[in-house]
UniProtKB/Swiss-Prot annotation:
Region annotation (Disordered) ranges: 424-464
Species per Swiss-Prot/TrEMBL record: Banna virus
Protein name, entry field: Non-structural protein 1
Gene name of the record: Segment-5
UniProt feature, compositional bias: Basic and acidic residues: 455-464
Bias type Polar residues, positions: 424-453
InterPro entries xrefs: VP5/VP6
Length: 508
């Protein structure tokens, strides 16, 4: 099956604003820092120093935190905050508080904390960028050593956020230029784009966040081994799993389920030749899988994006929100992709074949191997071996019935069932021609004499369905279970014994 996907939302790891509140007992009460971390464990996994100081803002900056949450919609809010945005909010509350200008605060909420909802898909985010940028210009905050600053590069505007991680914020139309600036500073970034992707005269009304990648490893357990999958694929797989949970919840009608992505290729840019040479076998396999899973048809406004879903994986998924459930689903999804898209791993219960050769699995952690091509070669060799084994099995089996038939001169083979059907037809014809009173002798033995003095039996039968040899020369029928060939002295199997006549006629 396929589900639609859009380009109008971020692929970032997010949590809902409502998660800051006690959802079980009192929704107007902010939870403690320990409860918040426990209930949203996935966003803190492999996060390094992103969230240092979280406990302090839940204790010492609680009033400022309340103001931000109220602006974001409070306990009933549908908005979400990204992983990087939460990190920036912690740093902001450690040093600053909200402005008296409501417009500036609204811009801070979106540009710095990356709190967003579906309303941003309709546009207006570039205006928020301009509001905050002009405010920083008025305050002459152009020093990148500060938490918030502004700058220009090749006449393109950007906002620089220097927190526990670094984020460049710019209009989507300027993203490539600002990414060039980040690369010149050795900042390896990933992009999240939020806003409307409908093009107008000034470009798309969307804002791009270029955040420096984490130094920590993002790992997954695959086929009993641990591999580093990197932050980008970790984010992508999280979005995939969350979307597939929606498919599982709406298994009878998944037409309304959509995956929100931000590029034609999905969430991770496809590897070029240089990237493939540097990537591990697992990353190359995931890159190959993306080319299969993330489909695009058409161009411009007619472009249709979709994501391929396998029903056999939906049946394997666990439904839940806990950290362990999410991690387990991510691990299962990677294994599923390796089997179905790359032919690596153990054969799936749905019948999809794969190769789990140990040397092939070792290549997943190594660089410089085209693991997908190697898997195809291994699968081809497996198929050849299976065909060879089938041929050997055929040669070792018993010879066919046709090959075991021995026919003498003037003889032809006829199966017992075919012979009986012909016999019944001939018997019916003969009975119709005879008188109503039958000869008792003929009842036990029905023999015709040809002009040459030979005798032909009209009702040769054999109980077993292995067939009999019907000789066109003389044949005597002694009873319904015994066939005796006078010319060849050959007789068929019998269940009723030999008659005395047969015993006297049998050759030595």
């Amino acid at each position: 099956m396929e589900i639609l996907r859009t380009k109008s939302q971020s692929a970032a790891v997010v949590i809902g604003i409502s998660k800051f509140f006690d959802e079980k007992e009192n929704r107007d009460v902010i939870v403690t820092a320990s409860d918040f971390k426990r209930n949203n464990a996935f966003i803190f996994k492999d996060s390094g120093n992103y969230f240092l100081g979280l406990e302090n803002i839940f204790r010492n900056s609680l009033d400022e935190l309340k103001d931000i949450l109220i602006l974001a919609g409070g306990s009933i809010s549908k908005s979400k905050i990204t992983q990087a945005g939460l990190s920036h909010m912690i740093t902001f509350l450690e040093k600053l508080c909200l402005s008296d200008d409501a417009g500036v605060n609204k811009a801070l909420i979106f540009i710095v904390f990356q709190i967003h909802d579906s309303s941003q898909r309709r546009g207006g985010v570039c205006t928020l960028f301009d509001v905050l940028y002009n405010y920083l210009v008025q305050r002459k905050l152009n020093q990148e050593s500060e938490f918030l600053s502004y700058g220009t590069y090749k006449e393109k505007k950007y906002i620089y956020i220097n927190g526990k991680t670094v984020t460049y914020v710019c209009k989507n139309a300027d993203a490539l230029t600002i990414k060039e600036l980040a690369n010149s500073k050795s900042h390896m970034t990933y992009a999240d784009t939020i806003g409307s992707f409908r093009k107008n005269a000034s470009g798309m009304d969307a804002v791009t966040f270029l955040t420096v990648k984490m130094d920590t490893m993002h790992t997954a357990s695959i086929f009993g081994k641990t591999y580093n999958i990197g932050q980008l694929y970790y984010r992508q797989l999280n979005v995939e799993v969350n979307t597939l949970k929606k498919v599982l919840a709406n298994i009878d009608d998944h037409s309304r389920v959509k995956m929100h992505g931000n590029s034609r290729d999905g969430f991770v840019k496809r590897l070029d030749d240089a990237g493939k040479s540097r990537a591990t076998g697992l990353i190359r396999a995931l890159d190959h899988s993306n080319s299969i899973r993330f489909k695009s048809i058409g161009m411009g406004r007619d472009e249709k994006l979709s994501y391929v879903v396998d029903s056999c994986f939906i049946r394997k998924m666990q439904n839940g929100r806990g950290l362990c459930v999410t991690i387990d689903n991510i691990n299962k999804l990677i294994e599923h992709k390796l089997v179905h898209d790359c032919g690596i791993g153990r054969t799936c219960s749905c019948g999809a074949k794969a190769c789990d050769d140990e040397s092939l699995l070792d290549q997943l952690a190594e660089r410089g191997h085209d693991v997908v091509a190697n898997a195809k070669e291994a699968m081809s060799a497996m198929c050849d071996d299976e065909e060879h084994a089938e041929k050997i099995a055929v040669t070792k089996s018993d010879a066919k019935l046709d090959d075991r038939i021995v026919q003498g001169k003037g003889s032809r083979y006829m199966s017992a069932s075919v012979y009986r059907s012909r016999l019944n037809t001939e018997s019916t014809t003969t009975n119709n021609a005879q008188s109503p009173v039958s000869d008792p002798v003929n009842a036990s033995a029905n023999v015709k004499t040809s002009p040459a003095g030979t005798h032909t039996d009209e009702s040769v039968m054999k109980k077993e369905d292995h067939g009999v040899i019907v000789n066109e020369s003389t044949t005597f029928k002694i009873n319904s279970d015994v066939v005796f060939d006078a010319a060849e002295a050959t007789f068929a199997d019998t269940s009723s014994g030999l008659s005395s006549l047969l015993k006297t006629k049998m050759k030595f």
